[in-house]
Amino acid sequence: MRYLTAGESHGPSLTAIIEGIPAGLTLHPADIDHELQRRQGGYGRGARMSIETDRVQISSGVRHGKTTGAPITLTVINKDHQKWLDVMAVGDIEETLKLKRRVKHPRPGHADLVGGIKYHFNDLRDALERSSARETTMRVAVGAVAKRILAELGIDMLHHILIFGGITITIPSKLSFRELQERALHSELSIVNPKQEEEIKTYIDKIKKEGDTIGGIIETIVQGVPAGLGSYVQWDKKLDAKLAQAVLSINAFKGVEFGVGFDMGFQKGSQVMDEITWTPTQGYGRQTNHLGGFEGGMTTGQPIVVKGVMKPIPTLYKPLMSVDIDSHEPYKATVERSDPTALPAAGVIMENVVATVLAKEILETFSSTTMSELQKAFSDYRAYVKQF
C-alpha cells in the first residue's frame, strides 16, 4: 500500500491516490466523510472551517460499494478557492495581480522562509500553500480507508488529549477502552474528563482574544493488534519507528513517545519492563503496558499507545517580528487565517495516520489481494499466536 497527496490550501481541490488496497473492501464516501467531518470539528477552530464542508469524491478504484483492487482516487473540493482565483491561477496573470497576496514577511515557526530559500521562491506563498495543514485533509481521507481495513480485522482505535495548552487532563481511573473512546468522541475538546471542558474553553477564548495560540499532547490507543507486526532484523522495518515518522510528519508535531515514554528516563528497568503472563484462554499477555505495545520494533499484542506533542500554531494574529525578504528590514510576520488551537483536529489526523501505517504493515505482511484472503490469513495468524 502506498499513497500520494496533492493540492494547495487555496487551490481548486485536494487529491490522494492510494494503491494496494485489496479488492472486496466495502467502502462508501460516507465512511471517508465521517472522518473528514471529525477533522473539521472541535472547539477553537477558525473561519476556514465555517467555509469548507469537506466531502470526498471517489473517482476510481471503487464500484458498487466495493474496492476493485485498482488505485483509488480521492478528491476534496476547496470551496474557498473561488475567492482566490487570481492568486492561485495556474496560467500566467498580470504582474499587479501576482502581487495581490504576495507573502514576503515569513512567519516564525512555519515553512515560509526555509521553503522559499530551498525552492528559490520570490513569493513565499508557494511554500505556504503546500505546507499548510490543509494538506492533512487527504491524509485523513486515506486514513479513513485504512480504518475500514482495520475494522474488518477487529482492530479499533481512539485518541484523546492529555495536555491542553498547559492544562493537564485528569483521567478517571479504570476507564475501559470503550469508555475512553465514547468520552473522547462526545467531547468538543477530545478530552475524557467532562468536568474540565469549561475551564479549557474559557482558556481557549482568552488565548484567541490575546491573538495567541496553544499546543498540547495527544494520545492515540490502538486495540486488537496481535503480537509480531514489524521486525527487528533491519532498522527501517521497526514498526514503532514507522509510526514515529508518520506522527512527526503531521504539521506542527515536534515529539513522539510510546507507553510511558520519556518518563522511562527516571525509572529503573524493574519498574519499566512489562512482565509476561500466559493463560489457556488468552495465550500470552502482560502485567503492564509501560512500553506502549512494542518490544524490538514489534507489537507485543498489548494496546499500542503512542503520544505526540503539537506545538502552538505558528500563525499569530498578534504577529512576531520577521524580516522583509526584499529589503531585509524588520517587519511584522504575515498574518494568514488561523485558529487559537487545532488540537482536537490534530488528534483526528494523528489517529488516521497511525491507522494508515498499521494497515500498510498488515497488507505487506499478509496475503491481501482480496479482503477475504486477508481476513483468513489474519485470522489464522491470530490463532497461531494464541497457541504458540
UniProtKB/Swiss-Prot annotation:
This protein's UniProt keywords: Amino-acid biosynthesis, Aromatic amino acid biosynthesis, FAD, Flavoprotein, FMN, Lyase, NADP
EC assignment: 4.2.3.5
Entry-linked PROSITE patterns: CHORISMATE_SYNTHASE_1, CHORISMATE_SYNTHASE_2, CHORISMATE_SYNTHASE_3
Catalysed reactions, as listed in the record: 5-O-(1-carboxyvinyl)-3-phosphoshikimate = chorismate + phosphate
GO biological process assignments: amino acid biosynthetic process; aromatic amino acid family biosynthetic process; chorismate biosynthetic process
UniProt cross-references to InterPro entries, sorted A to Z: Chorismate_synth, Chorismate_synth_AroC_sf, Chorismate_synthase_CS
An annotated Gene Ontology molecular function: chorismate synthase activity
Function: This reaction introduces a second double bond into the aromatic ring system.
The keyword Lyase is assigned to this record: yes
Residue positions binding FMN: R130, S131, S132, N251, A252, G296, K311, P312, I313, P314, T315, R337
Family: Belongs to the chorismate synthase family.
Record flagged with keyword Ribosomal protein: no
HAMAP family noted in UniProt: Chorismate_synth
Protein name per Swiss-Prot or TrEMBL: Chorismate synthase
Residues bound to NADP(+): R39, R45
Source species: Streptococcus pyogenes serotype M49 (strain NZ131)
Record's subunit section: Homotetramer.
GO cellular component terms, semicolon-separated: cytosol
Essential cofactor(s): FMNH2
PANTHER family named in the record: CHORISMATE SYNTHASE (PTHR21085:SF0)
Pathway: Metabolic intermediate biosynthesis; chorismate biosynthesis; chorismate from D-erythrose 4-phosphate and phosphoenolpyruvate: step 7/7
Cofactor binding, per record: Reduced FMN (FMNH(2)).
